[in-house]
C-alpha cells in the first residue's frame, strides 16, 4: 500500500491541475483577446493576477499555477507560487521546480530551474522602466523600456530583496538587499546597494 501512495498522490495532483486549468481557461482567454485587440495591453492580465493571488490554501496554489501556465510566455507545470504573489507582465518565463514565496512581485523575469524567490521579494524589469519628460516629471511605466532579468538555476533571493539585474546560478541574495548590478554565479551578495560578500563554494584546488 505504501508503494502505491506516491502514484495516488501524483494522480490526484494531475487531476487537480487539469480541473484548475479548465476553471481558469475563460480568464486566460480574456487575456489573449485583450492582447490581440489592444496591441499588448495587460489590464485584464493584471486583474485576474490580483484575483487569483488572494485565493487561500492549496487551492490558491493550483489556481495561480494554472492561470500562469496559460498566460505567461512560458511556464512550467510544476512550480509553487504562494498567497499574494503575482506576475506583473506576461513576458515572464518560469522553469520547473521554482518556488515563489508569499507576496513576491515578479516583473519581466526569467526564473531558472529550482530557484527560490523569498517572501515579499521584488524582481523588477530592469532599472529604466520610467523616464523623465522635458518638464522633469517622471512618466508611467514604458513597456518599450522593460528589460528581462535572469535568475539563474537554483539561485536564492532572500525575503524582501529588490532585484533589478541578472543573478547567476546558485547565487544567494541576502534578505533586504537591493541589486542593481549583475551578480555572477555561486556567490553571496548583501546590502543596499548590494556588494559581494563571499563565494558560496570554493573552487577545487588543482595539484601541479
List the predicted regions and their residue ranges:
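Conserved beta-to-alpha transition
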Residues: 184-185
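Flexible, glycine/small-residue-enriched loop-and-beta-strand segment within the central core
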Residues: 54-66, 73-74, 83-95, 99-167, ...
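Conserved active-site beta-strand element of glycosyltransferases/polysaccharide synthases
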Residues: 189
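Terminal amphipathic alpha-helical/low-complexity segments used for targeting or macromolecular assembly
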Residues: 1-73, 136, 154, 192-208
Amino acid at each position: 500500500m505504501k508503494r502505491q501512495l506516491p502514484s495516488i498522490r501524483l494522480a490526484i495532483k494531475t487531476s487537480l491541475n487539469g480541473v484548475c486549468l479548465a476553471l481558469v481557461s475563460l480568464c486566460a482567454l480574456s487575456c489573449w483577446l485583450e492582447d490581440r485587440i489592444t496591441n499588448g495591453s495587460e489590464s485584464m492580465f493584471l486583474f485576474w493576477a490580483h484575483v487569483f493571488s488572494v485565493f487561500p490554501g492549496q487551492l490558491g496554489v493550483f489556481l495561480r499555477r494554472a492561470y500562469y501556465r496559460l498566460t505567461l510566455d512560458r511556464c512550467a507545470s510544476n512550480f509553487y507560487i504562494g498567497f499574494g504573489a503575482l506576475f506583473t507582465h506576461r513576458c515572464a518565463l518560469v522553469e520547473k521546480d521554482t518556488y515563489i514565496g508569499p507576496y513576491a512581485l515578479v516583473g519581466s523575469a526569467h526564473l531558472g530551474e529550482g530557484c527560490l524567490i523569498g517572501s515579499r521579494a521584488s524582481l523588477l524589469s530592469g532599472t529604466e522602466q520610467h523616464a523623465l519628460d522635458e518638464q522633469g516629471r517622471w512618466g508611467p511605466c514604458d513597456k518599450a523600456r522593460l528589460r528581462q532579468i535572469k535568475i539563474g538555476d537554483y539561485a536564492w533571493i532572500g525575503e524582501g530583496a529588490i532585484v533589478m539585474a541578472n543573478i547567476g546560478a546558485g547565487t544567494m541574495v541576502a534578505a533586504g538587499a537591493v541589486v542593481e548590478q549583475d551578480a555572477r554565479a555561486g556567490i553571496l551578495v548583501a546590502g543596499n546597494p548590494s556588494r559581494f560578500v563571499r563565494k558560496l563554494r570554493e573552487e577545487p584546488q588543482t595539484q601541479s
